[in-house]
Design a protein with these regions (language model features):
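A generic structural signal for beta-strand entry/edge sites
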Residues: 7-9, 50-52, 80-82, 106-110
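Short, surface-exposed coil-to-beta transition loops
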Residues: 9-11, 67-72, 94-99
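Hydrophobic pocket/interface hotspot
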Residues: 22-26, 33, 75, 111-113, ...
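Glycine-rich portal/gate segments that line the openings of hydrophobic small-molecule binding cavities
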Residues: 44-91, 142-151
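Beta-strand/loop substructures that line and gate deep hydrophobic ligand-binding cavities in soluble
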Residues: 87-135, 139
């Protein structure tokens, strides 16, 4: 597992010995991630139109300082290799966008998550927030890899 970046701009990646289709199936099973990922309390697909998905997620984790934070995301899927998402609306989030990519490599796939997040927080909390979100990203990538292996 690799995590690069700081201050809300990150690239996390992990190699998983599964097919791209299997990895994609786990990654896009949005509602099943609630309670499995350390920060996703609830997840609901609000609408789907072709490759566009509208998703409502509730986050609760150390980086939310104990609060449940709701976010509505638009996801553009390009199966089985790429997913782009961006914030439509959210509580205490100024900006949230990212790209998931699945790239075949020898012995499996490289799963990469590029993320940009700007919370709506007092500036004195930002350092703590970024430390906590980095820990969460590491945990999330490891759990995602485990879910892909279980399939």
């Amino acid at each position: 597992m690799s995590l690069k970046g700081s201050n809300g701009k990150y690239s996390a990646s992990v190699v998983v010995p599964v097919s791209a289709q299997k990895a994609w199936g786990v990654l896009t099973n949005y509602e099943s991630m609630a309670g499995v990922m350390p920060d996703i309390q609830q997840a609901k697909v609000v609408s789907r139109s072709g490759r566009l998905v509208e998703l409502l997620q509730t986050y609760k984790a150390p980086y939310t300082f104990g609060l449940s934070i709701n976010a509505r995301l638009q996801v553009q899927e390009t199966p089985p290799s790429r997913m782009r998402y961006q914030l439509i609306s959210g509580e205490r989030i100024k900006e949230l966008q990212g790209i998931w990519s699945i790239t075949p490599v020898r012995g499996g796939v490289l799963v990469r998550h590029q993320l940009q997040v700007v919370p709506q927080l007092p500036s004195f909390l930002l350092g703590t927030y970024y430390e906590l979100i980095e820990t969460n990203l590491r945990q999330s990538m490891q759990i995602l890899a485990q879910q892909m292996l279980k399939g």
